[in-house]
Amino acid sequence: MVFRSPLDLYSSHFLLPNFADSHHCSLLLASSGGGSGASGGGGGAGGGGGGNRAGGGGAGGAGGGSGGGGSRAPPEELSMFQLPTLNFSPEQVASVCETLEETGDIERLGRFLWSLPVAPGACEAINKHESILRARAVVAFHTGNFRDLYHILENHKFTKESHGKLQAMWLEAHYQEAEKLRGRPLGPVDKYRVRKKFPLPRTIWDGEQKTHCFKERTRSLLREWYLQDPYPNPSKKRELAQATGLTPTQVGNWFKNRRQRDRAAAAKNRLQHQAIGPSGMRSLAEPGCPTHGSAESPSTAASPTTSVSSLTERADTGTSILSVTSSDSECDV
């Protein structure tokens, strides 16, 4: 379906009708504002044709005056020859807006909203329709007219079904303004500050705090896949996204964060082993301490070597607990 300006729906004869009745033709010229003088001059010429030139001129002037005064028609007659309008109902306009918004044709959607003729009295109903308001917000966002976008979002209450898209546009618009002001891309901390400075208006937010933590079932499924393959390819990310209800980007961020946590835990574990190793060697070198061989025998369970090994086990246990705890708190993905 091709949408064009409503003016394209009318041929040129609608603009300049070829009426056989000269009276209707004069009414059309009068409605344009420039035909009264011509029709008056014609009446003057007709009235002064039988006299002399002076009398003819006078009659022409009188005829011109009478012609100029008589060419005006009542408003109800002039309304017949004004530019025709399309009697679109608010529901029809909303349906077109929804279709263009879903197809992503923002340019055509903007032209449709700009050149839309409506029936008298329908403007108020159209301005209250959510689909039309959302379409205007989308056009304002994509054209960079953020002031109009903020005005629409702050002054009209939207249903929960529209909150997600409108919230994303609100935040992205403020991000772009902040980037333009600072002259550089925003980092995570910068975006956090922008969100704090420009909170979501209650017209597109139900007041509930949005949590960035995943549910336990989602985390469990992600851990299972992580143990099988810490580096999933894009197809596996899409498959896992469908299984968990997340987006492929969220899945990729979770795997990336989990790998970083595991690397940090492994590095901390190595540092603890390096710190425990020299102290254990010094304790073995002291007089009166059993040899390393006797430390491995069952009869030396209470030896200093055993205490060092138990300390190592406790350190390893603490590291593993720390690793699991930090890896399982998948927030801010």
From Swiss-Prot:
CDD domains: homeodomain. Interacts with EYA4; translocates EYA4 from the cytoplasm to the nucleus and promotes activation of their target genes. Interacts with MTA1 and HDAC2; represses its own transcription. Interacts with MTA1; facilitates the binding of SIX3 to the core DNA motif of SIX3 promoter. Interacts with EYA1; promotes EYA1 translocation to the nucleus. Interacts with TLE1 and TLE5 (via Q domain); can act in combination with either TLE1 and/or TLE5 leading to transcriptional repression or activation, respectively. Residues 207-266 bind DNA. This is Homeobox protein SIX3. Disruption phenotype: Embryos die at birth and lack most head structures anterior to the midbrain, including the eyes and nose. Embryonic SHH and SIX3 double heterozygous mice exhibit a semilobar holoprosencephaly-like phenotype and a dorsoventral patterning defects in telencephalon. Embryonic WNT1 and SIX3 double homozygous mice lack cerebellum and colliculus and have a severely reduced midbrain. Conditional knockout in eye exhibit drastically reduced lens size, cataracts, or absence of the lens. It holds the Pfam family SIX1_SD. One of its GO terms (molecular function) is transcription corepressor binding. The gene is Six3. Residues 233-235 are annotated as: Bind to RHO promoter. Residues 57-76, 233-252, 259-333 are annotated as: Disordered. It is found in: Nucleus. It comes from Mus musculus. Transcriptional regulator which can act as both a transcriptional repressor and activator by binding a ATTA homeodomain core recognition sequence on these target genes. During forebrain development represses WNT1 expression allowing zona limitans intrathalamica formation and thereby ensuring proper anterio-posterior patterning of the diencephalon and formation of the rostral diencephalon. Acts as a direct upstream activator of SHH expression in the rostral diencephalon ventral midline and that in turn SHH maintains its expression.
